[in-house]
Amino acid sequence: MKILSSLKSAKTRHKDCQVVRRRGKVYVINKTNPRFKARQR
């Protein structure tokens, strides 16, 4: 999982990426290709 300051590029890397808020943190998750997971500080 990458930790990024901005998720703008992370959410457009793959068509199945989706932005989710969990416990006050913003995540990009990808069910089909978990390589593209990312988190914002």
From Swiss-Prot:
Which keywords does this Swiss-Prot/TrEMBL entry list?
Ribonucleoprotein, Ribosomal protein
Q: Which molecular-function annotations from GO does this UniProt entry contain?
A: structural constituent of ribosome
Ribonucleoprotein recorded as keyword: yes
Q: Which InterPro entries match?
A: Ribosomal_bL36, Ribosomal_bL36_sp, Ribosomal_L36_bact
Asked whether the keyword Ribonucleoprotein is assigned, the reply is yes
Report the record's Gene Ontology biological process terms. translation
Q: Which domain of life is it from?
A: Bacteria
One Gene Ontology cellular component annotation? Answer: ribonucleoprotein complex
Q: Which family does it belong to?
A: Belongs to the bacterial ribosomal protein bL36 family.
Which NCBIfam families does the entry mention? PRK00831.1, rpmJ_bact
What is this protein called in UniProt?
Large ribosomal subunit protein bL36
Q: What's the source species for this entry?
A: Hydrogenovibrio crunogenus (strain DSM 25203 / XCL-2)
The coding gene here is rpmJ
